[in-house]
């Protein structure tokens, strides 16, 4: 009697089958299960990971990420010789985790290209398979509605609830039997180290929204340098954001929330010096946030957000608007 395969081998076999099934337009497509993509919560951003990144934003090949938005003119190519898109990526989820925010925002902003960036290998593999499965499901629904409109569309199995999630957590719009605006063609994800290579992907004033949801708090003082909010990184975010663009942050750690406010010069005894981050961002009022649908998605659609809700924890939100660049003195 042969011994059962090890857990790692089971996970590898499942991921290969899931990736292959997600690319097939026949048969029922199931969403990948997170339990087969588990990875430790931390990844050292200062390590030399084997990462692919473009020489500059003008060299980035987005055609494989957003095939539905590729420019039909084959002569339109970037500096790397790749096909250009009809529009630029405008929304970025830094540290996208398992992709809950992207999936939640996709039908809300169907004509806006959104990208998730994640450093963990198995997690980004899950997000890629999840998006591909969602696209295939939507294509099947679209095809079935046009070719056999008189018969009901086949039911699409819901993603099993994991990590103790309630049954309601699985019945999200992504498991709906009806078409979703955009068909999830406007979202994608890639593996990257934002702390090192963020400017390689996005040009000046390209983005309209940046999301930083439940980032690793790095509690130890010697680890604070690895936090994704800092003076230097805030300057890079400001470079990529359009004037009027928004940077969204949410955390369940109160100390980290105050860290965010301090590093945007919204709290503490820091003197606001000329040319500092205070000249680049202003905090958005609670009244404005109440009418922003993206805030509700950020609170409730991410996996971490759902976990905090189940545990009855607190969520601390701070959103900052990119100011227009000051005029040069005459």
Swiss-Prot record:
One of its GO terms (molecular function) is tRNA binding. Residues 172-185 have a biased composition (Polar residues). S-adenosyl-L-methionine binds at residues 95, 118-119, 193-194, 213, 302-304. Pathway: tRNA modification; N(7)-methylguanine-tRNA biosynthesis. Residues 144-162 have a biased composition (Low complexity). Belongs to the class I-like SAM-binding methyltransferase superfamily. TrmB family. This is tRNA (guanine-N(7)-)-methyltransferase.
């Amino acid at each position: 009697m042969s011994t059962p395969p090890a857990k790692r081998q089971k996970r590898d076999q499942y991921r290969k089958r899931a990736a292959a099934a997600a690319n097939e337009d026949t048969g029922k497509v199931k969403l990948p299960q997170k339990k087969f993509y588990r990875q430790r919560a931390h990844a050292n951003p200062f390590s030399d990971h084997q990462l692919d990144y473009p020489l500059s934003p003008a060299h980035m090949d987005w055609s494989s990420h957003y095939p539905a938005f590729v420019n039909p003119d084959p002569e339109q190519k970037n500096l790397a010789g790749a096909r250009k898109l009809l529009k630029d990526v405008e929304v970025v989820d830094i540290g996208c985790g398992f992709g809950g925010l992207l999936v939640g925002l996709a039908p809300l902003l169907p004509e806006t290209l959104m990208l998730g960036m994640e450093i963990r290998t198995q997690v980004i593999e899950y997000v890629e398979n999840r998006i591909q499965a969602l696209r295939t499901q939507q294509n099947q629904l679209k095809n079935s509605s046009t070719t056999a409109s008189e018969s009901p569309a086949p039911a699409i199995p819901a993603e099993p609830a994991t990590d103790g999630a309630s049954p309601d957590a699985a019945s999200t719009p992504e498991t709906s039997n009806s078409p979703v605006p955009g068909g999830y063609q406007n979202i994608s994800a890639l593996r990257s180290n934002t702390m090192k290579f963020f400017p390689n992907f996005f040009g000046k004033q390209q983005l309209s929204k940046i999301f930083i949801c439940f980032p690793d708090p790095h509690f130890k003082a010697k680890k604070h340098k690895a936090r994704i909010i800092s003076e230097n990184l805030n300057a890079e975010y400001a470079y990529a954001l359009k004037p009027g663009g928004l940077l969204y942050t949410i955390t369940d750690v109160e100390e980290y929330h105050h860290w965010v406010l301090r590093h945007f010069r919204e709290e503490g005894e820091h003197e606001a010096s000329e040319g500092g981050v205070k000249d680049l961002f202003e905090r958005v009022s609670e009244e404005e946030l109440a009418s922003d649908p993206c805030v509700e998605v950020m609170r409730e659609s991410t996996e971490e957000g759902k976990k905090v809700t189940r545990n009855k924890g607190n969520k601390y939100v701070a959103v900052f608007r990119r100011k227009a660049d000051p005029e040069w003195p005459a």
